[in-house]
Amino acid sequence: MILETERRAVVEHASELADLTPGRTGNLSVRGSGDDTDAGPGDAFAITPTGVPYDGFDVEDVPVVGTDGERLDGEMAPSSEVPMHSAIYRREDVGAIVHTHSPWATALAVANQPLPPIHYMIVAVGKRVPVAEYAPYGTDELAENIVTAMTEAGSTASLIENHGLVVTAPDLETALENTHHVESLARLYLESRSAGLEPQTLTDDQLETVLEKFESYGQ
């Protein structure tokens, strides 16, 4: 079975989407080595299947797709957002992608409002979370809009206008953790604004200090 480790990771973590996105919307993927496929090294990924409950598929069902969009393996059809995942994986630092319609982040997205640096934890994904311009879901146009927004903002996450949120990371656990961070910060921002308050934003210098401290954080 090709990309077995990555497919198992998709099955293991897919249920976590249930806490982040309604119904069967949203998707996640993990980049594989590609060494055991016809794709080149790093040029294939395992992704959640389309339209299936998060606990409704097994390892052999998980689709494997090349970064060129070609379906390589898996009993089920891949997510409709394959173009988005394929485009983002052009960035060599990306090892996993999580896409949700989580309510607080999506509330910002439908208002076309980026998430500013109101809390130091935003540095988990960058200095702000931009909004990618709207395009129909599952299209190459949307995929390119997302890549452009993240690249221009220097962010590993982006809101998607009138749609939702996408977060990238070197691994799936970090991508999911950072998705929760963005959702939490979006809630803080919107609740502060709803209370008639004006959230204060951190300066670039303050954010740089946080980034330096993060380099020595953890075990």
Curated annotation (Swiss-Prot):
Pfam families: Aldolase_II (PF00596). Its EC number is 4.1.2.-. Its cofactor is Zn(2+). InterPro entries: Aldolase_class_II_sugar_metab (IPR050197), Aldolase_II/adducin_N (IPR001303), Aldolase_II/adducin_N_sf (IPR036409). GO terms for cellular component: cytosol. Belongs to the aldolase class II family. This is Ribulose-1-phosphate aldolase. It comes from Halopiger xanaduensis (strain DSM 18323 / JCM 14033 / SH-6).
